[in-house]
């Protein structure tokens, strides 16, 4: 096991599953969460900003993690949100979220803040994206010299072989679909694509918050208000996923899956424990707004797994390991929570 923590920047659009990514970033012992940027996506950007600050307040991390407002809209098209899945606020389903006790930082732009974090952790920092890729693509478009200084870019997005939840043919995943132009900017960049890790729906659909998972989160012995908050978020998420996408056993908790490969690749835990299986591919997506398959992932080329070329596309994971990391982080968060 490595001694040093893994420096990460999280760009997210909270979002029920983003909430768990924030929990892991804050409280998993492996991660040093340097900052959060919030983008449009699951809800309008003013909501995702508020939600991130509310979650950090609830977890006792107010002002400990700087929050910046990231990309506010897609590069070329009109924004789309997901109230049918996440509710109007982006975090519907609980009344336990507190009013944030701090504001988003305005001392610098999100581009400057991310630049500063990358340069301070040159060659070691990883960027985790659990929403649209607009924030990161904008950073690299404005400051392309930063590309060489990021170790990994871990992305929750896309679906292989036409698996999706958006567009008329349901062949695109939401995060890619809402800004495929920004996604292609990352996927097609020869300086970036080989350090990208993509966890697609094909993998995240295995990370189901079942009834048994809910019992581990909140039970007679572990019944804090913070745990109740996460239980209520999961229960709301379960209802919307059952109603809108037919998930009977519970909702898929997509976003925190993007953090798991980093635990293996930085040497925090062995591959035998993490169980991350992947293929290396060059990918792109259909970015024509008028195409019925807009946002669909296209596999351009496949490489041998032992190659250092091609985007790392996740296929499988030790799901028990995944939940164990979340339970450990929640145990730690319990001790700092401001809501009981």
Swiss-Prot record:
Optimum pH is 7.0-7.2. Keywords: Cytoplasm, Glycosidase, Hydrolase, Nucleus. Its main location: cytoplasm. Gene3D superfamilies: Ribonucleoside hydrolase-like. It is found in: Cytoplasm; Nucleus. It catalyses: uridine + H2O = D-ribose + uracil. Belongs to the IUNH family. This is Uridine nucleosidase. The lineage of its organism: Eukaryota, Fungi, Dikarya, Ascomycota, Saccharomycotina. The gene is URH1.
């Amino acid at each position: 096991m490595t001694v040093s923590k893994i420096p990460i920047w999280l760009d997210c659009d909270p979002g029920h599953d983003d909430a768990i990514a924030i929990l892991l970033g804050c409280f998993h012992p492996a991660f040093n969460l340097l900052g959060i940027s919030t983008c449009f996506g699951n809800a309008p950007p003013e909501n995702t900003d508020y939600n991130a600050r509310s979650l950090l307040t609830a977890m006792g991390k107010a002002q400990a993690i700087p929050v910046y407002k990231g990309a506010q809209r897609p590069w070329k098209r009109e924004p789309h949100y997901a109230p049918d899945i996440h509710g109007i606020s982006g975090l519907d389903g609980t009344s336990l979220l507190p009013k944030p006790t701090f504001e988003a930082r305005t001392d610098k732009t999100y581009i400057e803040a991310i630049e500063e974090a990358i340069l301070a952790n040159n060659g070691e920092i990883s960027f985790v994206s659990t929403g649209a890729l607009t924030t990161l693509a904008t950073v690299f478009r404005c400051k392309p010299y930063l590309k060489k200084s990021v170790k990994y870019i871990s992305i929750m997005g896309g679906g292989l072989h036409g698996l999706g939840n958006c567009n008329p043919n349901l062949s695109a995943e939401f995060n890619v679909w809402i800004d495929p132009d920004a996604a292609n900017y990352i996927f097609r960049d020869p300086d970036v694509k080989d350090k990208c890790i993509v966890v697609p729906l094909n993998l995240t659909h295995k990370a189901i918050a079942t009834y048994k998972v809910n019992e581990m989160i909140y039970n007679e012995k572990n019944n804090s208000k913070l745990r109740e908050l996460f239980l209520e978020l999961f229960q709301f998420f379960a209802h919307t996923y059952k109603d809108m996408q037919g998930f009977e056993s519970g909702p898929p908790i997509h976003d925190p899956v993007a953090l798991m490969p980093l635990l293996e690749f930085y040497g925090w835990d062995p591959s035998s424990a993490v169980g991350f299986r992947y293929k290396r591919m060059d990918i792109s997506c259909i970015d024509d707004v008028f195409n019925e398959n807009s946002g669909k992932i296209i596999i351009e080329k496949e490489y041998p797994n032992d190659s250092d070329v091609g985007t790392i596309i996740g296929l499988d994971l030790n799901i028990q390991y995944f939940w164990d990391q979340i339970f450990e982080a929640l145990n730690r968060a319990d001790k700092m929570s401001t809501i009981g």
